[in-house]
Amino acid sequence: MKIFLVILSVFFFNGCFGLAYKTPISNPPISYDPYTTTIGSLYAKNLKENPKHSAAILLEDGFDALLHRVGLIRMSQKSIDMQTYIYKNDLSSQVIAKELLNAANRGVKVRILLDDNGLDSDFSDIMLLNFHKNIEVKIFNPYYIRNKGLRYFEMLADYERIKKRMHNKLFIVDNFAVIIGGRNIGDNYFDNDLDTNFLDLDALFFGGVASKAKESFENYWRFHRSIPVSLLRTHKRLKNNVKEIAKLHEKIPISAEDANEFEKKVNDFIERFQKYQYPIYYGNAIFLADLPAKIDTPLYSPIKIAFEKALKNAKDSVFIASSYFIPGKKIMKIFKNQISKGIELNILTNSLSSTDAIVVYGAWERYRNKLVRMGANVYEIRNDFFNRQIKGRFSTKHSLHGKTIVFDDALTLLGSFNIDPRSAYINTESAVLFDNPSFAKRVRLSLKDHAQQSWHLVLYRHRVIWEATEEGILIHEKNSPDTSFFLRLIKEWSKVLPEREL
């Protein structure tokens, strides 16, 4: 067995690292004045008068977030840069792929950077776009083995590299508009999945923050572990499917009636957008992102530093929503100190029944009861949240995916960063720190609404229990709600795993 692993290791190390360093130099990005584009001209006057400010539109609703992406693609004139951790091959993803293809046909330069962990298949529609003359697709830190079922062997042989992923999410249009937040590309991020939908949040920013996001994208795009699709071992087989590009419109599984309705909604969005009918917030926005070299060598996290600084400086309240919550000893000390000063700490995260990572919940449990006893308001998402919130939809489960923090109803940290060791030390992340009280209050109200529909963890006779209101009746649970004994047992077993590796 040892000999087998040694041979496997040599094979993978030679294969993976050889692949990484053969990356050709990409064409330089095109240069233009973003204020002269359709989108840029809409906000040119206000932002040129206040060059230190950025403008923001909050995207709370999943379907609205999809409309913004599609609408921005249709209004684009020069370039689109997309960076994401997950790109599924479902309805929403196919719609966006089709829109990107249409933009490229108009002459828009499109660059797509995907993490290999979140790619459904080398033969997904998004990969086919690489054969268009105006579209480039790269894969970040790819596996040498392209068959997903066999990748566990590569993980054993090259674990230190494979575990480090690009978790950033950026959607940059014409170097002027950028969507930043927690949403990947897939049906369950846009409230369009019948099995599981994610509660999430992102925002559309205009102005200076977009140029900083663009700089970050360029760093990742030129990084030696961003590999062109043309260098993947499956490229020749993928090329055989190149004719499928022309059939993207036909492949989307949607009725003519639904297609017409969607078309109407996109056109309505564009009209409202160009008439400034969406609430717009102006303020100082700081773009924060890890360097891509973080996956090769330990580097400090600018987002973690900004979070800890804002947490220490909070004077009144902090509201944290994080799908994964493993704060660690240092942050727990800050929490304790701030609560002792009378600062209100609210935490919203996943329950055992709503999480998509049982091992992470096992680690969260080490801190959960301590936080309740400290005096923090701790909430866990109910997995039937969506069914109770939106009538007529039949999603069987809902899960928190957002990563948003509001400090003193004034400052908002929004992006891909979870409060856990993986975001701090292993993955690369991106976020924006936005200073606008009205925006912060709107975000807090949204998070508060989620919390009120969730389980509230409270002390009862020195024990932490789950409490919620259902049809006006207060209900209690002594164990993790909506879970089986077997699920709770797996959670207990998972606690043997080291926190830093989760």
Curated annotation (Swiss-Prot):
Matches recorded under InterPro entries: PLD-like_dom (IPR025202), PLipase_D/transphosphatidylase (IPR001736)
Topology in the lipid bilayer: Single-pass membrane protein
Any Gene Ontology biological process: cardiolipin biosynthetic process
Gene3D superfamilies membership: Endonuclease Chain A
PROSITE patterns linked to this entry: PLD
Entry-linked CDD domains: PLDc_ymdC_like_1, PLDc_ymdC_like_2
Keyword Membrane included in the entry's annotation: yes
GO terms, molecular function: phosphatidyltransferase activity
Protein name as catalogued: Uncharacterized protein jhp_0176
One GO cellular component term: plasma membrane
Chain segments annotated as transmembrane: 1-21
Presence of the UniProt keyword Phosphoprotein in the record: no
SMART domains: PLDc
Top-level division of the source organism's lineage: Bacteria
Major location category of this protein: membrane
Record-stated family: Belongs to the phospholipase D family. Cardiolipin synthase subfamily.
Subcellular location: Cell membrane
Keyword vocabulary terms for this entry: Cell membrane, Membrane, Repeat, Transferase, Transmembrane, Transmembrane helix
Domain spans labelled PLD phosphodiesterase: 162-189, 396-423
